[in-house]
């Protein structure tokens, strides 16, 4: 309920006496502060989330030069922090940080560490994950970590723009975040034209930014080593980036890489980042706050047929397993299964595993990124997100064969609870603003 010292987010349409729409936007404010009209605030007092009200501001009231009608919808309400309760303290605009970058480039790790850092500053943070599939390791991990999150599934942000917009508004209504990280699927590009610019156009009151992540190890090798159409996607991601975050830079000597990046991407902001270093995360967030992100950012010159062909070269498998072991070796079997699946002759985009709903293990094109010790357990669950350069049938058979090997080796029973294996469809963005 709206009362003194609550943070309120409302959407409103403002019309003059002739019925002309002057504003159609949203605002977040401290109720009782001079941030918005005191007459409007008095009329909103006592309303709850989802409630609506029409308020009339008559000519002469608060220096109004006409009769103005406000059709108001209350989106969200929460208690103000002591800092926010300082009368007149401005409530900063919602920050939407878009992240793109190739599979396994370190986006999720950076988001997780940024959430931890911002939580120390009492900033409410939320995350939107995105994938071509429907069972997301990263989405379930953020849920386990207690970070408010939503998922945009079965396609990229650009092809499911309305779902992304709905996810943001859901989080605003239910969690009132100050910052939302939106992580696009790693096989996606052209986000400036299809996501960033539409958000900027439809929600100018938000502070929207865009970062593209790239694994320093892959950049250092000069090629991601995939089919040329997949390499095309990777190159286009970097080409459109206003900010390039070279992640995992602590794993290489980046001297030569920095020279190459300056030569290939002049004029771009390039950060070399170890996302487990809090100072690096703080620098990235500060950079996003200081660089102007405007509609003048160039949209890609991109061949969608080549882009679509590249996505179709990747097979995607989402599978949930339960492992039962009479010898308390369920976790041992799960970890052995992970290693067996990773032993493939096909090029790995990203292998992500979630063990027992909370332990994430990953393999990328550059190799393994996580390790885990097994503990005695009679049962374990394993969620698999596999993105590999092959066809769906070959990938499904590879995983099935790995399961058979581990069942025999560990004398355990592995049950498939859900499974989906497919190739992404042709990218058809909802919007594209050149």
Predicted regions and their residues:
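A structural signal for short, well-ordered beta-strand segments
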Residues: 10-12, 70-74, 99, 210, ...
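Canonical P-loop GTPase G-domain recognition
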Residues: 231, 235, 239-311
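P-loop NTP-binding site
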Residues: 90-113, 290-434
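Conserved nucleotide-binding/hydrolysis micro-motifs of P-loop NTPases
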Residues: 61, 78, 132-135, 186-189, ...
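Short, aromatic/basic amphipathic alpha-helical patches
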Residues: 139-146, 257-263, 398-403
């Amino acid at each position: 309920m709206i009362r003194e010292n609550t943070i309120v987010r409302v959407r409103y349409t403002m019309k003059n006496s002739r019925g002309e729409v002057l504003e159609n936007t949203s605002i977040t404010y401290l109720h009782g502060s001079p941030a918005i009209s005191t007459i409007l605030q008095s009329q909103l007092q006592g309303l709850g989330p989802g409630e609506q009200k029409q308020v009339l501001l008559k000519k002469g009231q608060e220096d109004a030069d006409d009769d103005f009608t406000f059709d108001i919808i209350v989106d969200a309400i929460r208690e103000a922090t002591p800092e926010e309760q300082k009368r007149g303290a401005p409530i900063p605009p919602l920050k939407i940080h878009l992240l793109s970058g190739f599979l396994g480039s370190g986006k999720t790790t950076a988001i997780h560490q940024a959430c931890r850092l911002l939580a120390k500053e009492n900033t409410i943070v939320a995350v939107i994950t995105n994938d071509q599939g429907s069972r997301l390791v990263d989405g379930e991990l953020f849920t386990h970590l207690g970070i408010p999150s939503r998922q945009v599934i079965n396609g990229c942000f650009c092809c499911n723009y309305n779902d992304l917009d709905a996810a943001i508004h859901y989080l605003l209504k239910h969690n009132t975040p100050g910052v939302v990280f939106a992580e696009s699927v790693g096989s996606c590009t052209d986000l400036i034209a299809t996501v960033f610019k539409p958000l900027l156009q439809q929600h100018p009151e938000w502070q929207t930014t865009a970062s593209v992540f790239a694994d320093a190890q892959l950049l250092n090798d000069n090629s991601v080593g995939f089919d040329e159409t997949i390499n095309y996607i990777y190159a286009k991601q970097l080409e459109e980036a206003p900010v390039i975050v070279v992640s995992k830079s602590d794993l290489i000597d980046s001297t030569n890489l920095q020279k190459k990046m300056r030569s290939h991407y002049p004029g771009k902001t390039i950060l070399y980042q170890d996302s487990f270093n809090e100072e690096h995360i703080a620098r990235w967030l500060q950079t996003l706050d200081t660089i102007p992100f405007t509609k003048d950012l160039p949209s890609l010159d991109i061949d969608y047929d080549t882009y679509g062909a590249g996505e179709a070269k990747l097979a995607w498998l989402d599978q949930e397993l339960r492992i039962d072991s009479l010898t308390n070796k369920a976790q041992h079997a799960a970890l052995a299964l992970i290693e067996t699946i990773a032993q493939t002759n096909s090029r790995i985009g990203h292998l992500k595993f979630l063990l027992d709903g909370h332990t994430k293990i990953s393999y990328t094109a550059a190799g393994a990124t996580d390790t885990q010790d097994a503990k005695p357990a009679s049962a374990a669950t394993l969620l698999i997100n596999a993105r590999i350069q092959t066809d769906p049938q070959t990938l499904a058979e590879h995983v099935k064969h790995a399961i058979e090997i581990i069942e025999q080796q560990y004398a355990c029973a592995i049950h498939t609870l859900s499974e989906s294996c497919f190739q992404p469809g042709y990218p058809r963005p909802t919007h594209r603003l050149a």
